[in-house]
Amino acid sequence: MKKKIRVLVVDDSAFMRRCLKDILENEEDMEVIDTARDGNEAVKKAVELRPDVITLDINMPVMDGLTALQYIMSLAPCPVVIISSLSTEGALTTFEALELGAVDFVAKPGGTVSLGIKQLADEIVSKVRIAALSNKELLSSSRNFKKLLKRRNQEVTRKVYENKISKKEIVVVIGVSTGGPKTLMEILPYLPSDFPAAVLVVQHMPPGFTQSFAQRLDQSCNLKVKEAEDKAFIEPGTVIIAKGGWHLVVERDSRSSKLITRLTQKPEETLYKPSINVTMKSVLENVDGRNIIGILLTGMGDDGADMMVEIRKRGGLTIAESQETAIVYGMPRAAVERGGAEIVAPAYKISDILLKKVNEYARTSEY
């Protein structure tokens, strides 16, 4: 018999604890081994019971979720799925939790909670399953990993390009899902302000969170980071975050022929919105393949893998995050297995690779 996923449910609301317990125990491969009503209880039970996954509320008495998360990651590292409020303040707190080691989050519904939480049952179950597959060794080593990154990148952030102005349109497309916010924080802040390429980031994320995510990244990066807008020009030295609930595509402006972003609901049938494949395909249709860099980071499934193959066929550079640092080695693995990854590297080396390659692209003669 297959081993069940052992879940610890943490929420200060008895009603929410009961709802989450019912949702999870309705699945044959899951069992709720215990519940906790505050962060203090959560830490004690995490150490004592060693669950496979914890669902964690943020706003709780005695000890809040963020404090509890730090103790859990230090004393009993475990994949954590945050159950968070869909408010501006809630979104910012959620990203702080993701940077501290939580692997994913589910937005608590507004209005009637009893109806809303049941509508989210499929999402909750799916994210708990994916969390159970995450690389637990990375959770326990996250603090040392961050220290290594800070040390290694002190000089990198001060690099200045000899060729600041390039006539080439160099576009970097990054696709990422579960574990993405933490991984992106290990790459984007180490790119200099004169980075001569535009960066498009497609992070699987629900509506209402990507604006706060872009703002948080903007505070940490040398590059300008913003949420995608319809009909906005794509400029070098800018990071554009795909808007939750919309596909991000690239087109040519009819007057200037410059690259612009478009937000669209089509195609409707994709599993994710935004979709990595959709964005990469549109970039391939509008930019010389030799000036494209495709990157696939941590995440479940295979979104982006097919287009990584196409980018490589057209002469672009493709990079897949290695299993060494991927929280969930799904999407990068798919790219590697399909022959879509020219380079396979841990997250902490990707900024260096980008700096080197984009500088080479910018300095070579025009095609």
From Swiss-Prot:
PTM per Swiss-Prot/TrEMBL: Phosphorylated by CheA. Phosphorylation of the N-terminal regulatory domain activates the methylesterase activity.
UniProt KW keywords: Chemotaxis, Cytoplasm, Hydrolase, Phosphoprotein
Assigned EC number: 3.1.1.61, 3.5.1.44
Residues bearing PTM 4-aspartylphosphate: 57
Reaction catalyzed: [protein]-L-glutamate 5-O-methyl ester + H2O = L-glutamyl-[protein] + methanol + H(+); L-glutaminyl-[protein] + H2O = L-glutamyl-[protein] + NH4(+)
The CheB-type methylesterase domain, residue ranges: 165-361
Catalytic machinery residues: 177, 204, 303
UniProt keyword Transcription, yes or no: no
One Pfam assignment: Response_reg
Response regulatory domain mapped to chain residues: 6-123
One of the record's GO molecular function terms: protein-glutamate methylesterase activity
Primary residence: cytoplasm
Top-level taxon of origin: Bacteria
Functional summary from the UniProt entry: Involved in chemotaxis. Part of a chemotaxis signal transduction system that modulates chemotaxis in response to various stimuli. Catalyzes the demethylation of specific methylglutamate residues introduced into the chemoreceptors (methyl-accepting chemotaxis proteins or MCP) by CheR. Also mediates the irreversible deamidation of specific glutamine residues to glutamic acid.
Domain-level remarks: Contains a C-terminal catalytic domain, and an N-terminal region which modulates catalytic activity.
Family: Belongs to the CheB family.
Protein name stated in the entry: Protein-glutamate methylesterase/protein-glutamine glutaminase
Species this protein is from: Caldanaerobacter subterraneus subsp. tengcongensis (strain DSM 15242 / JCM 11007 / NBRC 100824 / MB4)
Lineage of source species: Bacteria, Bacillati, Bacillota, Clostridia, Thermoanaerobacterales
Gene name of this polypeptide: cheB
